[in-house]
C-alpha cells in the first residue's frame, strides 16, 4: 500500500493531539478486526520550529512562534515526501522550555499512515501538496486558551501569565491571519468541543476508504 499522509490541523488547544492519539488507536483496532497489520507514524509540526540557539532564552521567549515563518516547512515537506517513499527520516526534537531545537534528532521509520499534526499545516501550499486527506479541528478560542493554560503550565514548564500574554499577542492574531483562512483547505472539519469518540469515528470513516484504494 502506498503510504498515506493525513493532516490534523487546527488552533492550539483545539484537541488535535487528542484526536491524533484516538485516531491512531482506532485505526490499529480496525485493521486487527480484518487481521491486517497497519503501521502508523506521527509527525508533529512543532518539531520543525527553526533553531533559535543563537539567541538568549529571553530573546527566544518573545519571538512570534505562531507565524508560519517560525517553522521550517521546507524540511517538513522533505521529510513527508521521504516517508511517502518509504524512507526513514530523522526529525528534529523541539524543547518547549528552552524555545529551541534539541541537539539530537529522532529516527522515524516509514509507515502505512503518517499522521502529521500541527496548527499551520493547511496554510502552507507545499505541505498541502503532500497530503492525502486533511482534517481541521475547530474550537472556540476561549476554550483553546483554557486548555492551553493547563497543558503549558503542567507539561511545558510555562507560567500562566506567559501563556496568557503569548495568546493575546501572537496566538489570537495569527489564528485570524493564517489558521482561520486555512480551514477552506480541509477535507473534513471536526468540532474539538464535542465527544472525542465522535470526532475519531468521523475521521476514521474518511480514512478507511484510502486504505483500500
Residue ranges and their predicted role:
Residues 19:
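Hydrophobic positions on the alpha1 helix immediately C-terminal to the Walker A/P-loop
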Residues 102-154:
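ATP-dependent NMP and nucleoside kinases share a basic, alpha-helical "lid"
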Residues 41, 50-98:
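Conserved nucleotide-sensing/catalytic segment adjacent to the nucleotide-binding pocket
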Residues 31-53:
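Short beta-strand-centered segment that lines the nucleotide-binding/catalytic pocket of NTP-utilizing
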Residues 109-110, 150-153, 172-213:
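NTP-dependent small-molecule kinase module
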Amino acid at each position: 500500500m502506498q503510504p498515506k499522509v493525513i493532516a490534523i490541523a487546527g488552533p492550539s488547544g483545539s484537541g488535535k493531539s487528542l484526536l491524533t492519539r484516538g485516531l491512531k488507536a482506532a485505526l490499529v483496532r480496525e485493521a486487527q478486526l480484518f487481521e491486517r497489520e497497519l503501521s502508523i507514524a506521527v509527525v508533529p509540526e512543532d518539531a520543525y520550529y527553526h533553531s533559535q540557539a543563537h539567541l538568549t532564552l529571553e530573546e527566544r521567549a518573545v519571538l512570534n512562534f505562531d507565524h508560519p515563518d517560525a517553522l521550517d516547512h521546507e524540511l517538513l515537506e522533505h521529510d513527508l515526501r521521504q516517508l511517502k517513499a518509504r524512507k526513514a527520516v530523522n526529525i528534529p526534537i523541539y524543547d518547549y522550555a528552552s524555545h529551541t531545537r534539541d541537539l539530537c534528532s529522532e529516527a522515524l521509520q516509514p509507515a502505512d499512515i503518517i499522521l502529521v499534526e500541527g496548527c499551520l499545516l493547511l496554510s502552507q501550499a507545499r505541505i498541502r501538496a503532500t497530503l492525502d486527506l486533511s482534517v481541521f479541528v475547530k474550537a472556540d478560542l476561549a476554550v483553546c486558551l483554557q486548555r492551553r493554560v493547563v497543558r503549558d503550565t503542567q507539561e511545558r514548564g510555562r507560567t500562566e501569565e506567559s501563556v496568557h500574554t503569548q495568546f493575546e499577542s501572537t496566538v489570537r492574531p495569527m489564528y485570524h491571519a493564517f489558521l482561520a483562512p486555512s480551514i477552506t483547505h480541509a477535507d473534513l472539519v471536526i468540532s474539538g468541543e464535542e465527544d472525542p469518540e465522535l470526532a475519531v469515528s468521523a475521521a476514521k470513516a474518511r480514512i478507511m476508504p484510502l486504505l483500500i484504494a
